[in-house]
Amino acid sequence: MRSILRATFAIAVAMLAIGFQPTTVSAQSVSTFLGGSGTTSTTQQSWTTAGNWNTATVPTGTAVWAQINSSTSPILRILYTSTSVGSGTSLTVGAISFLPTLAVSSGSTYAIQNNSAGTKGTLKFYGIDTTIDGTARRIILDNQTSLSDVNFTQTLAGQDFELYSSGVINVAAGTQLTLTPLIRDGSGSRTVTKIGRGVLSLAGSSTSSTYAGGFSLEGGIVQWASSGVSGTNPFGSGPLTLRSGTLRSTTTTGKSINSNVVLDGSVTLGSTDPSFNGNITVNSSSGSLATTIASNSIVTIAGGSTAWNQSTSGTGSLTLAGSGQVRFTSLSTLAHTGSTVVQAGTLNMQGNMTSASAVSVFNAATLLGTGTISGATSILSGGTFSPGAQGGATGVFTFGSGGLSLAGQSLMEVAGVTRGTQYDGVDISGPLGYGGSLLLQFSGTLADNTALELFKGFSSQSGLFSSITVAGSYTGSLAESSGVWTGVFGAQTMTFTNSTGNLVVVPEPAVVGLLGGVGMVVTVAGLRRRRASMQLASRKRAVEV
């Protein structure tokens, strides 16, 4: 038998249900529903038929406790929307299975619990289209007892949760709801929304769900045990909309999102909890999946690293926060027209940001990478800019006509003389504003008469670094005069010039002339040769006279 989850699929873990029972049983009368076979006629299944009750009277009133027994099966099935319960306050059952609908006619609170003797049985919700007073409501699983985890498990082959309308899963704080059956559409294209501060854990067959309307995270935590593939994964074949809450792995193993993503609020990816800190990857499925920034959104990377392979679009702004790293890979083209703010953590840009929107890197945040940003980019005071990949790999970062404004710390690494592969470089087609500090980290010394193009191509330059410091194979700082920074390190002189963006190393003592190009270095030895030649020519003329 296929168990079907019809209806609004609104399962809420928060306010009432499992575990509540009247404390003064003796003050209530008990009526037992017999219900015949429960399979042959609506008369035998009706709660409003007096003959179906052992008292031959339909129980009503607040002093009545309706106890339900099944004479032919250990599972009672309430089958029809026409069934109703009076104003009783408790249904006591061993194991109960709701197929399509449970309807109650009063505004009372109903507690559905397992009250069997000895080892407790199983409480099963197979279909939950709950109607109270003619209005669709939610069945709520209460955390008022010792219950902390609620598990909906797949016990028979072919059991699925089938959606006949869209709805909400509400999991209260301190509670975890685990779903293992596959979730699929029963008719139409249905959506599932997660609210509440508790944990929804998707495991088993639920990680291969196929419902097409999409999954919306609007509160609490959602974690998943297996990532699936595009079209068959924990979030179905529709978009994953992130409005509020946290997405994390069920373990320390990384997990992937294989759905189109809609950013529409504030969401956290990953976790600082060592039990759930697996990295999150947002996959593109060979470019078929993309991210829409529907409104001004905040993505917090709680820890670790999130690789974002999807391209972006939309009019919203994107703010990155948290201690972790977001890496927009070479698979991603960022075309959203709202601004991008790195409020905390690290933005590792390997992709191409084609929109003209501004990028800002705040205090204690970092921008690194070898990608391209077209819009105006500002490294604010306290922020860090480091071209190249994290961990010492060098590279070239490219900025478009929007230019680059530096007011924080710029860190560039030098391990040789080949631009991009051995030392960091910055290409800029727009204006360059110097500011903040520049730290040059050397791995090895440079040969005499070497010139490095640190900053290249800018349309104009302005401002000054507050300091230029060298570390590693060279140690010390450079002093500035009229836009030229100079430092002496052993037998070499190192010079950085604002107007060219070049770093030049020559022997000491030396006179350095940069005649508009790299490598146009005139040393003292050259001057001496020319001076000697001039003296020789003068002596020759004197002899001839």
Residue ranges of predicted features:
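N-terminal extracellular ligand-recognition/capping segment immediately after the signal peptide
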Residues: S70-G94, S237-G245, T251-N260, S355, ...
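Extracellular repeat-rich scaffold modules on cell surfaces
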Residues: S29-G61, K120, Q144-S237, L269-N363, ...
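Bacterial N-terminal signal peptides that target proteins for export
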Residues: M1-A12, T23, A510, L527-R531
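Extracellular/surface-exposed low-complexity segments
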Residues: I4-L5, L16-I68, S271, Q409, ...
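Glycine-rich repeat segments that build the extracellular carbohydrate-interaction surface of secreted
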Residues: V58-I78, L99, N348, S386, ...
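Extracellular beta-strand/loop-rich repeat segments of large surface/secreted proteins
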Residues: Q45, S275, N363-S459
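A short, hydrophobic C-terminal helix/tail in secreted or cell-surface proteins
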Residues: E508-L527
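C-terminal membrane-anchoring or membrane-association module
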Residues: T523-V545
